[in-house]
Swiss-Prot record:
Similarity comment: Belongs to the IlvD/Edd family.
InterPro entries: DiOHA_6PGluconate_deHydtase_CS, ILV_EDD_N, IlvD/EDD_N
Superkingdom of the source species: Bacteria
Reaction it catalyzes: (2R)-2,3-dihydroxy-3-methylbutanoate = 3-methyl-2-oxobutanoate + H2O; (2R,3R)-2,3-dihydroxy-3-methylpentanoate = (S)-3-methyl-2-oxopentanoate + H2O
Name this polypeptide is given: Dihydroxy-acid dehydratase
Modified residues (N6-carboxylysine): 121
The protein's enzyme class: lyase
Pathway given in the UniProt record: Amino-acid biosynthesis; L-isoleucine biosynthesis; L-isoleucine from 2-oxobutanoate: step 3/4; Amino-acid biosynthesis; L-valine biosynthesis; L-valine from pyruvate: step 3/4
Entry annotated with the keyword Amino-acid biosynthesis: yes
Originating organism: Clostridium pasteurianum
Positions of [2Fe-2S] cluster binding: 119, 191
Cofactor: binding details: Binds 1 [2Fe-2S] cluster per subunit. This cluster acts as a Lewis acid cofactor.
Cellular component aspect of the GO annotation: cytosol
Keywords from the UniProt entry: 2Fe-2S, Amino-acid biosynthesis, Branched-chain amino acid biosynthesis, Iron, Iron-sulfur, Lyase, Magnesium, Metal-binding
Amino acid sequence: MRSDSARKGLEKAPHRSLFKALGFIDEEMERPLIGIASSYSEIIPGHMNLDKVVQAVKDGVRMAGGVPVTFGTIGVCDGISMNHKGMSYSLPSRQLIADSVEIVASAHAFDGIVLVPNCDKVVPGMMMAAARLDIPAIVISGGPMLAGNTCGKATDLSGVFEAVGAVKAGNMTEEELSELENTACPTCGSCSGMYTANSMNCLSEVLGLALPYNGTIPAVYSERLRLAKTSGMKIVDLVKKGLTPSKILTEEAFMNAITADMALGCSTNSLLHLPAIANEVGITID
């Protein structure tokens, strides 16, 4: 196993001592070491449930005979950061996310990795890292937010943006805007709609980096946790089979993703992210 380079042999006794400081026992030294990259935070609605998703992944890894270890990375909420100076930090965060996941996974010789993102730049950033690392990898996101219900009408975040203009134009009262503001985003999860997060989560399935329904099971459904547990089990299977992203992310896979992108009406930001992911495996999309 790849992790043997950090755990096996006489010269790795100090390394094993540090693993044992983490609570590892000798039996765990013989099992696949699975990293779990999480962008859990309390500032992004799409990420506030990721701790639950991570726990389900860990359970699945254990069930399949692996040893899970979690670590965190950053994330930016495009919705909160837009329309002020904060938006200038969003796209650069994608590169930092990819770099940070690569660094942790490489420095600690993980045998495989589970990527737990959810929002706009985090999903492609983690997929870029998976492609760059080329170790067995699987994506399981936090899932989309449920639609809101405002006075019996389905609503979402885009409706709140539109309502701001309606108030300025005199077509809506501030009281009506307040009611919409309070009801349009009713749960955790990536913003409801085919924005970048949901687009890239759907495309993660098409590219072959995620299990079916990763892009569509709502964040608040228990089915999301079941998928996370299954993903944890699957990564151990991928490690045993030696199935890495370079064997999955073919030119045909990217063409399929572009086709699905157009069929679903995905975010135009996919034009930024698909070529970046492809570049990590030496494929040019022009």
